[in-house]
Swiss-Prot record:
Belongs to the universal ribosomal protein uS10 family. Keywords: Ribonucleoprotein, Ribosomal protein. HAMAP family: Ribosomal_uS10. SUPFAM superfamilies: Ribosomal protein S10. Disulfide bonds: none annotated. The gene is rpsJ. Involved in the binding of tRNA to the ribosomes. GO terms for cellular component: ribonucleoprotein complex; ribosome. This is Small ribosomal subunit protein uS10. GO terms for biological process: translation. The keyword GTP-binding does not apply. Part of the 30S ribosomal subunit.
Length: 105
């Protein structure tokens, strides 16, 4: 019979604000440690930066431009040898708004 839990759970988190992201990571780490699972990470992944340049006025002044950038911060967590209790606790966990979570079992 195949067990419901695998050898590890890989959690990838993304957010625009690194402070909210770090709060979410600490909540996940605390929850996993309370259930007795070992944790590898959090591993900071490279920040994705996308820059956009637009003209300030519509028809005149080509030299007058404005630049905007958007940063996406990422973290990676591995929960090693999770128990069923760990999986249930992570399922009930509520994370801050603005954090994208990808979970691979």
């Amino acid at each position: 019979m195949v067990s419901m839990t695998s050898d590890r759970i890989r959690i990838k988190l993304k957010a625009y604000d690194y402070r909210i992201l770090d709060k979410a990571v600490t909540e996940i780490v605390d929850t996993a440690r309370n259930t007795g699972a070992a944790i590898a990470g959090p591993i900071p992944l490279p920040t994705q930066i996308s820059r956009t340049t637009i003209q300030r006025s519509v028809h005149v002044d080509k030299k007058s431009r404005e630049q905007f950038e958007m940063r996406i911060h990422k973290r990676l967590l591995d929960i090693l040898e999770p128990t069923q209790q760990t999986v249930d606790a992570l399922g009930k966990l509520s994370l801050p708004a603005g954090v994208d979570v990808e979970i691979k079992l």
